[in-house]
Structure formats: C-alpha cells, structure tokens
Amino acid sequence: MSDNEALDVEDYAQAGSGASLTFPIQCSALRKNGFVVIKGFPCKIVDMSTSKTGKHGHAKVNITAIDIFTGKKYEEICPSTHNIDVPNVSRKEYTVMDVQDGYLSLLDAGGEVKEDLALPEDDIGKEITQMLKEGKEPLVSVISALGKEGVVSVKVSNN
C-alpha cells in the first residue's frame, strides 16, 4: 500500500465524553442494590451469596440481578477474586413536554430539550399519556447505562 492510498482511507471514531461505559471491580466487593453487567446487560443486584472455598479453588460469589431496562432476571457465579464489569449508571429527571410519533419531548432542569427517547410501551408510557391528557406535567426519571437510556419512573411535577 502506498502513502497516497493510506491517506485516502479515513477512519472516524464515534464522538463521546471519553468516559468508559463500565469499570472492573472484584466480585467480592459487589454489594446488594449495586450494579453489575451480566451477559452484556446492565443489572441491579437483588441477591448475593458467597460459597466457601472448595477443594479446587476460590470462594464463589452467586449474584442474582435484574436488568434495569427490561426487568429480566439474570444469575452469575464468579470466583470472589476475579473482576467483573460494573456499568456507569446515571439517573436524570426530565419534564415531559409532549409526545410526538412515539417519542418523548423532554426538558431538563437546565432548559435543554431531548427528543430521542421513545415513549415506553408499558404502564409507565400509559401513565405519561394519561397525565398529558389530564393537563398534568409528568416528571420522568431516565436511567442511562452501557449507551442505552430508558424511562424508569414517572410522577406529577410539583410546579
């Protein structure tokens, strides 16, 4: 390959904050109500137990967790000395201004508009729609992890 050919090939990386989506932590340091990545899904730990060191190795940590977006239950067993990924999870509150074509029109506390989040198809989505029909101002909690976002709760704004 000549120098000219190499210059013609351009590679663009996705723009981002530079922050990692996950960070490693030792299995023995995990705690109930914490977060963990199981099978590529961000999950909240609902139950944990540790088995004793066996004849052939390490103590094992048994983790039961629920996907923070779908509510699906996952289980993982890992040696207590091994590392496991923990997702960087953030929660932000938005005021729902409108729903258009199945997408929420959201406003954050700083006045920034967000319009790329789909209206949930579950009870939360129905509740948002009902509040808007009644002229109420829904306030939603949006959770972000592993590059995904989802509405996890709704309440009436006090404004």
UniProtKB/Swiss-Prot annotation:
Annotated compartments: Cytoplasm
Post-translational modification: Lys-55 undergoes hypusination, a unique post-translational modification that consists in the addition of a butylamino group from spermidine to lysine side chain, leading to the formation of the unusual amino acid hypusine. eIF-5As are the only known proteins to undergo this modification, which is essential for their function.
Keyword match RNA-binding: yes
GO molecular function terms listed in the Swiss-Prot or TrEMBL record: ribosome binding; RNA binding; translation elongation factor activity
Single GO biological process annotation from the record: positive regulation of translational termination
Keywords: Cytoplasm, Elongation factor, Hypusine, Protein biosynthesis, RNA-binding
Entries under InterPro entries matching the protein: IF5A-like, IF5A-like_N, NA-bd_OB-fold, Rib_uL2_dom2, Trans_elong_IF5A_hypusine_site, Transl_elong_IF5A_C, Translation_prot_SH3-like_sf
SMART domains in the record: eIF-5a
Cellular-component GO terms for this entry: phagocytic vesicle
Residue numbers carrying Hypusine: 55
Function: Translation factor that promotes translation elongation and termination, particularly upon ribosome stalling at specific amino acid sequence contexts. Binds between the exit (E) and peptidyl (P) site of the ribosome and promotes rescue of stalled ribosome: specifically required for efficient translation of polyproline-containing peptides as well as other motifs that stall the ribosome. Acts as a ribosome quality control (RQC) cofactor by joining the RQC complex to facilitate peptidyl transfer during CAT tailing step.
Entry's family note: Belongs to the eIF-5A family.
PANTHER family: TRANSLATION INITIATION FACTOR 5A FAMILY MEMBER (PTHR11673)
Protein name (Swiss-Prot/TrEMBL): Eukaryotic translation initiation factor 5A
Organism: Dictyostelium discoideum (Social amoeba)
Lineage, highest ranks first: Eukaryota, Amoebozoa, Evosea, Eumycetozoa, Dictyostelia
Gene label: eif5a
